């Protein structure tokens, strides 16, 4: 009997390590594939890379930037996706005017730190806003995130920043989704807030929203058991 495939899409500066708890729990039942974007600098080309590594039909899970990549997969090949899970992500284009310039300035400032001081130094500035405040005392968690960031280069960081700053709106994509969809958000995610995920759930026909308590943006690592349980229920419902 052919096993179902689940494709996992990491977020900004992340790799398979961000999914390790979920891979460990799900790989006994599903064929799990983690996409690698290389040094691509657009969400569209990241989605193309993910599609090239995937079988004809699969379930799709994206976290943060990976959620936006998942929406580009849905824009271009919705017929291949059996189910969709979007975690701590967004769907809007970069805003115009001062808000958009502020976002670009913030991202470019971190890129400057990466170029001048290294990726781990940049990570030490970036990570505190990515996790629940109480998790900042979890040295193993913080070190695992910093190690993951350290495996990337400033060039990859620059490419991914460009991809995010040039992101398209995916509102029409959400409205057109017809597969079982799970939307997950850490309640204390200050980067991709719960209100945004509530709006995504409203826009997506039949979507279910799962709120993960005591978690910020890095929900797969901060609360791995809760995230895994939500994914298992979503996958089982689609079987």
Regions found by a protein language model. Name each.
Residues 62-66, 70:
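Gly/Ala-rich beta-loop-alpha elbow adjacent to hydrolase catalytic centers
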Residues 179, 193-202:
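Short alpha-helix in the alpha/beta-hydrolase fold that links the catalytic acid
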Residues 98-99, 117-176:
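Conserved alpha/beta-hydrolase catalytic His-Asp/Glu region
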Residues 75-76, 80-117, 121-124:
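Flexible "cap/lid" loop of the alpha/beta hydrolase fold
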Residues 198-217:
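Catalytic histidine neighborhood in serine/cysteine hydrolases
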Residues 1-47, 59, 63:
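Conserved HGGG/HGGXW glycine-rich cap/lid loop of the alpha/beta-hydrolase fold
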Residues 177, 183-185, 189:
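Short beta-strand/loop motif that positions the catalytic acidic residue
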Residues 215-228:
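Catalytic histidine-centered segment of alpha/beta-hydrolase-like enzymes
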């Amino acid at each position: 009997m052919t096993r179902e495939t689940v494709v996992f899409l990491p977020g900004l500066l992340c790799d398979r390590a961000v999914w390790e708890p979920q891979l460990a729990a799900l790989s006994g039942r599903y064929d799990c594939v983690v996409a690698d974007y290389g040094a691509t600098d657009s969400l569209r080309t990241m989605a193309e890379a993910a599609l090239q590594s995937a079988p004809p039909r699969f379930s799709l899970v994206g976290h943060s930037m990976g959620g936006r990549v998942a929406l580009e997969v849905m824009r271009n090949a919705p017929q291949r996706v059996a189910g969709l899970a979007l975690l701590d992500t967004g769907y809007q284009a970069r805003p115009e005017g001062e808000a958009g310039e502020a976002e670009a300035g913030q991202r470019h400032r971190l890129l400057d730190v990466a170029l001048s001081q290294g990726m781990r130094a940049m990570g030490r500035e970036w990570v505190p806003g990515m996790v629940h405040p109480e998790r900042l005392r979890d040295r193993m968690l913080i070190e695992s995130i910093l190690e993951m960031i350290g495996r990337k280069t400033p060039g990859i960081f620059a490419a991914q920043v460009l991809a995010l700053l040039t992101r398209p709106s995916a509102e029409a994509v959400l409205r057109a989704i017809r597969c079982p969809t799970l939307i997950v958000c850490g309640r204390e995610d200050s980067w991709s807030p719960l209100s945004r995920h509530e709006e995504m759930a409203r826009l997506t026909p039949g979507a279910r929203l799962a709120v993960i308590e005591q978690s910020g943006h890095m929900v797969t690592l901060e609360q791995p058991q809760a995230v895994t349980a939500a994914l298992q229920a979503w996958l089982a419902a689609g079987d």
